[in-house]
Every structure is written in structure tokens, then in C-alpha cells.
């Protein structure tokens, strides 16, 4: 989906954990997860929704990007975390939503997947061509402003030669730079300049 959605970020992936982490959380033997044990043991620790549908991915695939905003849900109880992880695995195999429409339930796109499983994160929604959707850039911008249930942890920017860990101000500047002023989504447009 990174080529279909405008802006700085074109995708969102969910880290669900390693075998050790899933065991510690008490969900390793859940039926929704058991069938993916081999894939997890081979390094699949992310779930994402892209043109292949909802599937597991390794870090090498999920993090193959020029920029990554690392966000983490805040305030989830251990029980709610277990429910969410299990629910993400339950969605594996769901087809991709090429219309990017939050109102469809038989298919999903990346940020819609996050919203389906974690509605308490309060992701910003907008209407585009009559459809409700969630832009990854607005998800990041709203998080920087404290308007979602996510905590901002770090922003990593990279090119072919090097990578660097940057902060909130750099992320805000890159989000603004990705959108011409008249076309900026509301959460990006209202971010203060450095």
C-alpha cells in the first residue's frame, strides 16, 4: 500500500512478537497463533495488510522503508494486550481492501487493521471520495500531538548509506514537507513549524 497512499508514510505494520514474547504473554498456544508457530520461529514477528492481504512478515520485509515511526499502544492491560495480539492473528488471511474504505468489513488495509483491532487508539479518520479512511501520516501526526492512544517512541530515517534515530521535531518537519500546504491533511496542517 506504500505506493497507493500519498504522504511521508504509506504503510503501517504491527509488531506482534517473537516466540519468547508470545509465550511470556500467555498466547503462544492460542488456536489463532498455533498454526503460525513455524513462521514465527523463522522470524515472522510482524502482521501487515498490503496487496497480499493480511499476512505475517519478517523484520527485513516489514521494516524495508526509508522512514519508520515507532508507536506503541498506551494503557492496555495485560488481558487487553493478549486479546489484541490474538485478534491480529485471527485476521491473517483476510483480503486487502483496494478501495481503502473503513466501512467494508470483508477486507482491510493497513491502518484499518490497526483500527479494527485497537479502536481505543482513536485513529483520525477522514472522508476521501466518499469513503472513510485513515492516513498513516495523520496517524503519526495525531500521535505526536497526543490525540491517539499511541505513544511516540522514535523516528528512524534512512538512505542507502546510513540511518539515524531522530525525534519528534524531525518527524513533524518531514510530515509537513511531504504535503504541499493547500493539500495537507488536518492533523499534519496544524503541526507547528520548528
What are these regions (language model features)?
Residues 1-194:
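Cysteine-nucleophile amide-bond enzymes
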